[in-house]
Amino acid sequence: MITVSGWADTVLVCIVLTSFVLLGSSRLGACIRVVAFQGVLLGFLTLAARQDDPSLRAPILALVSTGLKGVAFPWLLFRALRDANVRREVEPFVGYGLSMLIGTSFLAGSLWLAGKLPLPNPAISTLLVPVALFTMLVGLFLIVSRRKALTQVLGYLVLENAIYAFGVGLVEGTPMVVELGVLLDLFVAVFVMGIAVFHINREFDHIDADRLSALRDWAG
């Protein structure tokens, strides 16, 4: 029989693999699906972390998290992708091969740093902290190393996934209303980002963030 730690380890390894897929893939549609799969994995992680909780709190939180991260957010992003009429991240600031190498260094650094951190509560898995740190670094890297605004939104979601994993795996007794409130804030943020990407593409015929940074205000 697989223990709680065993289930958590499996989920966390899958999160690492999906993060590497994001670093090495140029297809925006595939990246959205990978981030959606990460959201589903976090739902399973929620259930594994709260297995001893007899209340309905864990299933409700897992269901809401999976619904938002695995269904609602991808739907909004696919809609923005269709409206923007782009399919690939063609010329990122950092190439995909180098991104994979940097990701490997992120993973090694996260494993080293996790062993140095004094944690007040035992984690559900020894992999939780290094995987969460690694995923956080991957999210930040996607934000700064990709040109397309849509890919940067995906980086933001990956960053939030890492923070969510930290909270679920380490913090005990957080009121569910607070956790659901954070998910609602994230939903609003992604909704606004999707609208912004659509309007940027409509006004400028592209969603390249580096080209937008060259704009200047011409006050009369």
Residue ranges and their predicted role:
Residues 1-220:
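Alpha-helical transmembrane segments of multi-pass membrane proteins predominantly involved
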